[in-house]
Design a protein with these regions (language model features):
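Extended catalytic core of nucleotide-activated donor transferases of GT-like folds
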Residues: 5, 40-125, 227-228
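Acidic anion/phosphate-binding donor-loop and adjacent secondary structure
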Residues: 97-98, 137-153
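Aromatic "clamp/platform" in nucleotide-sugar-dependent glycosyltransferases that forms part
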Residues: 244
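Short alpha-helical donor nucleotide-sugar binding micro-motif in glycosyltransferases
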Residues: 230-236
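Conserved donor-binding/catalytic core segment of Leloir-type glycosyltransferases
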Residues: 4, 149-166, 172-175, 187-189
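A charged, aromatic-enriched C-terminal amphipathic alpha-helix characteristic of glycosyltransferases
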Residues: 305-316, 323-354
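Short hydrophobic beta-strand element within catalytic cores of glycosyltransferases
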Residues: 261-264, 280-282
Length: 360
């Protein structure tokens, strides 16, 4: 049996969801997992059976390797004397001094995309030989290809918490520019952000509702489990993600796995699985701008800029998907389904296992 100390959160955040899937698959490989919590574990119900054994093992192994799945600024503390592996998920292409110091602490780093690996190699050259790509995944038991909805309305959707980084300030402009009141279209939004208060959330919602097509935009609460998310995704024709910076983009991959179409920016981590065969790529021609949203990013660094050029590309893609659906020519995104087969959680954990074996 291989023993691994696992230091990660178990909750409803992206980090928590990634951690639960990795624990579940490591168990299947017969790992003896010792769990060191980050914050109070609050697992989704359908994960409890799979991760219960790990949660009960507080007695970390002093000599086993430790894998910590956490932010780039939080890789300073590990348990035991074994190999220390940090697995951060980051969105920007530069690090501050605190992050560099933290990223220099683990013996090895796992990052989830080749884009992220290049960022580490360029920003922290002395780590160049200690960084490996371990992509994230999707749940193939849940997100299966399913026929596109037969509704006359063309249904677009965006998943991901309200943030400037994710292009939520630009999306209402794009949607309103693409269509008129008489167009048979809907935009579904699932943007719950636990870090925002009610007033901040209302300000975001009004950016959408108080527009020409506000009545065609539908907000839904974040769903507590993946099966419900799949039901929503199966009612959608196309996802739209005008994101300036992503650390992975779980929902975009899940949409591809369902055979949905994507309109998405051609930058940062989701370039790992989004390409010109399976996605309508928004080429990022406008360079960079200060990464600032007065909430999560203070403008110290930059992210991709979205200007008229990128907006116009997105508008054209939206209209094109709508035209195809209206004329009966929009079929399942088979290229997306094929791509997704390489990105299961099982594959993720096989890469974790193979890399740990090579390193120890």
């Amino acid at each position: 049996t291989k023993t691994l100390n696992l230091h990660c959160p178990i909750n409803g955040t992206s980090y928590g969801y990634v951690s639960c899937n990795i624990i579940k698959e490591l168990n299947k490989l017969g790992y003896d997992l010792r769990y060191i919590p980050i914050a109070q574990p609050t697992p989704d119900e359908h994960f409890i059976a799979d991760i219960k054994s790990a949660l009960q093992r507080w007695d970390y192994d002093h000599d086993a390797p430790s894998l910590k799945i956490w932010h780039q600024h939080g890789l300073n503390s590990f348990v035991g004397r074994g190999l220390k592996i940090g697995m951060p998920i980051f969105e920007l292409e530069k690090f501050n001094a605190v992050e560099v110091h933290s990223l220099n602490n683990p013996d090895e780093l796992f990052v989830c995309s080749n884009w992220a690996k290049e960022v580490i190699q360029s920003e922290i050259p002395k780590r160049a030989n200690n960084v490996r790509v371990v992509h994230l995944g999707f749940d193939e038991e849940i997100f299966k290809p399913i026929d596109l909805p037969s509704s006359e309305t063309t249904i677009f959707a965006n998943f991901g918490k309200f943030e400037v980084r994710k292009g939520h300030d630009i999306l209402p402009l794009i949607f309103n520019k693409a269509f008129e009141r008489h167009d048979n279209v809907t935009l579904i939004m699932m943007p719950t952000n636990f870090f925002l208060n009610q007033e901040e959330t209302n300000t975001w919602v009004n950016k959408y509702k108080n527009t020409k097509l506000g009545h065609k935009i539908q907000f839904i609460d974040r769903v507590p489990d993946q099966k419900l998310l799949y039901q929503i995704m199966s009612q959608v024709h196309c996802g739209i993600f005008p994101s300036r910076a992503e650390g992975w983009n779980l929902e975009a991959l899940e949409l591809l796995a369902c055979g949905r179409h994507l309109i998405i920016t051609d930058c940062t981590a989701h370039t790992e699985f989004c390409n010109s065969e399976n996605s309508n790529l928004i080429k990022m021609n406008s360079g960079y701008e200060s990464a600032i949203d007065k909430k999560f990013f203070d403008g110290s660094f930059e992210w991709r800029k979205i200007s008229q050029d990128e907006i116009d590309q997105a508008v054209e893609y939206l209209r094109s998907i709508h035209r195809k659906h209206q004329s009966g020519d929009l079929s399942l995104n088979n290229a997306g389904v094929e791509t997704s087969k390489n990105f299961t959680w099982k594959n993720t954990v096989n890469m974790v296992d193979k890399n740990i074996e090579e390193m120890t």
